[in-house]
């Protein structure tokens, strides 16, 4: 900022510690444009999963209030809702609640995301139907984050993992290629104190797989999540399921 270099900031947060004072004082300094906040379900489910020591910070109502505060200062919020086979009914209830609060708030969007790599994963063949039923609950299905990106130019990389000069850094200063690698010592590239040890892995970019080259969703996905693929989980980005679900909702009207 002092050097006159243009920049902006985005954040992934649980929103528990965000206050109006913080938003007013620091967000302009950081040029904060976007925050992603995860809600794991309706009040009882959310508070059960989070289980904060400070029950007040972890209150569902506190998070909802903080999201409202953020949006009031014209910072966009994507509410990420993780979905597996066990919580689909609760997710429907959550979206009904969110629509009552944020249905007309243009600064708040939704990011329904399937959990991958667990025994409770929603089967790939069921995901479009699951999202279709969620989109039907919304006044404006275009509030779903991926739909907002439908008309943007095609991707040339799925995420920052494919960029040789992009990194994820954990709280101890360890450097990784991807946020999904954090906490896995075998995937560490180095640290911010001594530098990157594995220069070849830093530069290495996974090649687009043959099945992805032929996929109609490739321009919106470009191979998807390499971390999920390496774990034998579904690598496809949410767009792969949201786009056909959204098109079905449009055709119903």
Model regions and ranges:
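Radical SAM/AdoMet-radical enzyme domain recognition
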Residues: 1-113
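A structure-centric signal for secondary-structure junctions around beta-strands
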Residues: 6, 163, 209-212
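Flexible loop/turn segments at secondary-structure boundaries
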Residues: 17-19, 44-45, 86-88, 118-120, ...
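Short clusters of hydrophobic/aromatic residues that line enzyme substrate/ligand-binding pockets
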Residues: 46, 159, 189-192
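A generic alpha-helix structural signal
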Residues: 67, 95, 134-135, 193
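A C-terminal junction/extension of Radical SAM enzymes
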Residues: 76, 107-109, 113-184, 220
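Flexible mid-to-C-terminal extensions adjoining Fe-S/redox cofactors in radical SAM and related proteins
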Residues: 180-253
């Amino acid at each position: 900022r002092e050097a006159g270099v243009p920049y902006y900031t985005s954040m992934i947060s649980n929103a528990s510690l965000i206050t109006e004072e913080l938003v007013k004082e620091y967000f302009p300094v950081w040029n904060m444009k976007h925050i992603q906040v995860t809600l794991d379900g309706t009040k009882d489910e959310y508070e059960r999963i989070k289980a904060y020591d400070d029950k007040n910070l972890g209150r569902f109502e506190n998070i909802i209030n903080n999201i409202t505060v953020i949006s009031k200062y014209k910072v966009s919020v994507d509410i990420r809702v993780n979905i597996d086979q066990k919580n689909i009914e609760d997710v429907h209830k959550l979206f009904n609640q969110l629509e009552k609060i944020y249905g007309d708030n243009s600064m708040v969007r939704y990011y329904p995301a399937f959990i991958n790599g667990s025994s409770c994963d929603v089967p790939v063949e069921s995901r479009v139907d699951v999202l279709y039923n969620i989109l039907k609950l919304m006044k404006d299905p275009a509030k779903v984050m991926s739909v907002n990106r439908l008309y943007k130019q095609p991707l040339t990389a799925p995420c920052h993992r494919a960029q040789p000069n992009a990194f994820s850094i954990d709280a101890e200063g360890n450097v990784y290629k991807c946020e999904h690698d954090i906490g896995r010592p075998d995937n560490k590239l180095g640290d911010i104190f001594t530098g990157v040890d594995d220069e070849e892995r830093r530069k290495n970019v996974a090649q687009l797989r043959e099945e992805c080259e032929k996929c109609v969703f490739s321009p919106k996905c470009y191979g998807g999540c390499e971390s999920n693929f390496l774990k034998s989980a579904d690598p496809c980005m949410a767009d792969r399921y949201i786009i056909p679900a959204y098109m079905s909702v449009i055709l119903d009207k």
